[in-house]
Design a protein with these regions (language model features):
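Conserved catalytic core of the tyrosine transesterase superfamily
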Residues: 1-184
């Protein structure tokens, strides 16, 4: 029996960087959008998780040097640790200087989706893009850099390694290279 593999949309790291670079680092919406995209790509959070963050819980995190870890309750009520890159923290800090709301990102998931599509289009990205694509993009980037799929699974908060196997499109070319090196 042949099973159909689920295909996923993802962006190359350079495409994510192109989207971020296309957002001017000034103005309320620009700073919010830049911070949200940096957070989504840096942490691999689901959009619902990112939109639930509060400004107050971010402030202590921003004072730490380098990459910062942060525990969240994700899908299904499971706790996992996420990591904010220095670039994401810098973008959050710039946004917090203007944002006075309790929520870090006081927008709806639909608003976030429209924003991501608009920003990708402005950057010349023609692939299908959604907030969740940044999660797929991070997972793909980690695997391309040689991170073990079991660690990627834990990073994403997957309860089963099978959930992470949708990224096997990345692992397969690497397996071919490993095989070539081992069996010359």
């Amino acid at each position: 029996m042949i099973t159909k593999k689920r295909s996923i949309s993802f962006l190359e790291k350079q495409e994510v960087e192109k989207i971020i670079a296309g957002i001017k680092p000034e103005g309320s919406r620009n700073l919010r959008d830049r911070a949200l995209i940096e957070v989504l790509f840096s942490t691999g959070m689901r959009i619902s998780e990112a939109l639930a963050l509060t400004a107050d819980e971010m402030i202590p995190l921003l004072d730490e040097a380098g990459t910062s870890e942060f525990p969240i309750i994700g899908k299904g009520g499971w706790q996992r640790v996420i990591y904010f890159s220095p670039k994401a923290k810098q973008a959050i800090w710039a946004w917090l200087e203007l944002n006075k709301d309790e929520l870090l990102f006081p927008i709806t998931p639909r608003c976030a989706q429209k924003m991501v599509i608009k920003r990708a289009k402005a950057a010349g990205i023609t692939k299908r893009v959604s907030p969740h694509v940044f999660r797929h993009s991070l997972a793909t980037d980690l695997l391309k850099r040689g991170v073990d799929i079991a660690f990627v699974s834990k990073f994403l908060g997957h309860r089963s390694l099978n959930n992470t196997m949708i990224y096997s499109h990345i692992v397969s070319p690497q397996l071919k290279e490993i095989h070539k090196k081992l069996y010359k």
